[in-house]
Amino acid sequence: MQEKIELNQEVAKPLAEKHTPMMQQYLRIKADHPDTLLFYRMGDFYELFHDDAEKAARLLDITLTARGSSNGVPIRMAGIPFHSADQYLAKLVKLGESVAICEQIGDPAASKGPVERKVVRIVTPGTLTDASLLPDKSDTFLMAVHQQTTRRGVSKTGLAWLNLASGELRLMECEAAQLAREFERIRPAELLYADGIDLPAVACARTRLPEWHFDQDAGTRRLLEQLGVASLEPFGCAGLGAAIGAAGALLNYAATTQGQSLRHVRDIKVERESEFVGLDSATRRNLELTETLRGGESPTLFSLLDTCATAMGSRALRHWLHHPLRDPALPRARQQAIGVLIDHGIDDLRSALRKLADVERITSRLALLSARPRDLSSLRDTLRALPHVRACLQAEPDSSLLSLTVAELAVPQACLDLLISAVAEEPATVVRDGGVIARGYDAELDELRDISENCGQFLVDLESRERTRTGIANLRVEYNRVHGFYIEVTNGQADKVPDDYRRRQTLKNAERYITPELKAFEDKALSAQDRALAREKQLYDVLLQALLPHIGELQRVAGALARLDVLASLAERAQTLDWSCPERVGDNVIDIVQGRHPVVEGQLAAESVPFIANDCQLNEARKLLLITGPNMGGKSTFMRQTALIVLLACVGAYVPARRAVIGPVDRIFTRIGAADDLAGGRSTFMVEMTEAAAILHHATPASLVLMDEIGRGTSTFDGLALAWAIARHLLSHNRSHTLFATHYFELTQLPQEFPQAANVHLSAVEHGDGIVFLHAVQDGPASQSYGLQVAQLAGVPQPVIRAARKHLAWLEQQSADATPTPQLDLFAPPPHPDTSDDDEPVSIGKPVQVALLPEQAAVLDALSDLDPDSLTPRAALDALYRLKVLAGEVVDAA
């Protein structure tokens, strides 16, 4: 980037001589920001020129014009009003663009050439702080990633990410293979990286920086300077060289975009993989934590739980859901606090919380000196309300977490006193409109306001006094734009004019005068409003500086309020939805009684339909449940609800179950549903196998694994064999808690070989030609899949259903009448003495090519007509039966 800037500057030099002074200034500034759109302030507009203008016109749907010329070329330009710039910035940032804001910092009246201008900040997708640009209920992260190779040749990948709107900075190191999972967890809005790094796909803006920006030693110095400490050891950063290098690049970039230091970044939190329950991108997507499978915001677990009264509470809840904890200590403390809130009532507390402002983001804008007047008044009103919030908790000392929260909600009194004395009760939106500083805070400002506001009364009083003093009854004190203030006396009264009157204007029938007092008032009055606004701006800037020492206290208050809001929201949800407190134990067990899927139950409740609750028991003697049953029967719902109950327990919430006992959990894996990865060039089956491979490589005895219809994307025999082998591996090697849904009824034989496996099914009953799903989990395998009935429910035409029913009856009859053909038992051990390892193939002799009989050709034709990737499990079974019939005909013909 630096080379590009220097090149642009060199190009600009010879061109500058042929451009107007204003365009020369623009080109110099643009050369410093070649990769961003430049908003160039001209009066009441931000103008864009040349390529920037064309791009902005296209992206923002604004008018592109050409006015005049520079260097003989028409100047393409587009503009937006400065007072509505935020809405255009929001659109550009959403599209992944960055914008440099260039303001007029000189006085136009005093400028001989172009007004002095300067880029005051750069708005990028990852460095947003303005309320109008930020989503209320989610955080925006700037992330830097750096890969470092140690002297021993070990490659380390360091991550640093910053929420500029809160000042929260986090570091971690991971393996390069885990980057995709971390990107999905953190979801950065902008990613900083150097050349040569191999990055997985990530849906965010990318900014490439020179390698030297990520230097570890420079990063260490930058962090020490930022935190004001002599060592990073107390922060747990020892050995995190790659992450420290990333943090240095990130902090320098963020400070550059803001045009100032980051005063609110005062701490580092180091995250480690062992801290959280592992959730890969497939699991987060399949469980629909904060986004539906179709990309919507609702219905999700977050949308169900988010009854938070404040935006900072909603953001904290989102963070909790994506960061379930392995250590049960903090989740237990949260659940204890929720129980106390339920017992003591939460209505008053939630009512108090609803009146509070977003202290977290206001504090960040204070630190960056960009807080607006109504930010300050909202902050003042929130601090005033803290004693009432604390009073709602004073009677609830039974929770250590609530006690800590009460302590952290102590009012920063000096900050509050300053805001009360300095800020008007109802300030204007922006300082330039005036009325921001409270009356009585500054004597000079009060005087200027009095002059401006009481001008009319002063003139009335002066006129009355002068009539009395001079004896001129018809004397008038007036004002016009040309001559300003004056005293008018008719010619007939001219002999009574005092000596201190100075003639200002002569009219036909009157004379106009000015006095020293009126002249002094005129000087004040004519400039009072401008001077008042200037004084108010000066006082406001001083006020922002005076609030900086209170940033730490305000961050403490914001964190406590967000935590309290989440706990109150979870308490309300538990109470309203009849959830229970889970029991966390050390045994490797998942025992759920009458569990429900929280989101599905909520959707059904809206339609007054009851949800059928089910039990789930997994332990050392019962590690894998083979789940069979009809499509639409509820298999996937049962699996997902189990995972969500476990996740909620690890978050520290209550759970949708009558009772839940949850042991240690290190990861949750899901292999549910699939679709082609067109961008990655992967078929449905390839996506399925990739996810299955990740599970088989990483699942442990403390993991929860959900497998839904594995093997369906290939031929029936291949899929069946893979499904059996995967289930067997999970039982014998991973030994994870596993829910394994399948339509391969042959798999229901697995418990005969592995006692730790058990069959359960989702029940259904036929009613006439239709089917009634009972959604109840029962022991044992299902008897059939009810594929035709489900097809009928889906609206398949009746002629097709009738034809399928007849063909099914024929297939079943043919299958019953066919002579059994000798074949290898799929589940029989290989004909070798050692059956403990599946690596060796079973040798069944070399194939010999022979002439085909017509019956054999029919088998090949049937096989060639099959499209394995498009077969449903039921269709695959139908094809299998058909092939079996054809194989019988081959045997008969032989």
Swiss-Prot record:
UniProt source species: Cupriavidus pinatubonensis (strain JMP 134 / LMG 1197) (Cupriavidus necator (strain JMP 134))
Binding positions for ATP per the UniProt entry: 629-636
A GO biological process held by the record: mismatch repair
GO cellular component: cytosol
Lineage of source species: Bacteria, Pseudomonadati, Pseudomonadota, Betaproteobacteria, Burkholderiales
Tagged with keyword ATP-binding: yes
Family: Belongs to the DNA mismatch repair MutS family.
Transmembrane parts of this sequence: none
Record flagged with keyword Transferase: no
Identification of the protein by name: DNA mismatch repair protein MutS
Entry keyword set: ATP-binding, DNA damage, DNA repair, DNA-binding, Nucleotide-binding
Region (Disordered) residue spans: 819-840
GO molecular function list: ATP binding; ATP-dependent DNA damage sensor activity; damaged DNA binding; mismatched DNA binding
HAMAP family to which the protein is assigned, alphabetical: MutS
Function: This protein is involved in the repair of mismatches in DNA. It is possible that it carries out the mismatch recognition step. This protein has a weak ATPase activity.
InterPro entries, sorted: DNA_mismatch_repair_MutS, DNA_mismatch_repair_MutS-lik_N, DNA_mismatch_repair_MutS/MSH, DNA_mismatch_repair_MutS_C, DNA_mismatch_repair_MutS_clamp, DNA_mismatch_repair_MutS_core, DNA_mismatch_repair_MutS_N, DNA_mismatch_repair_MutS_sf
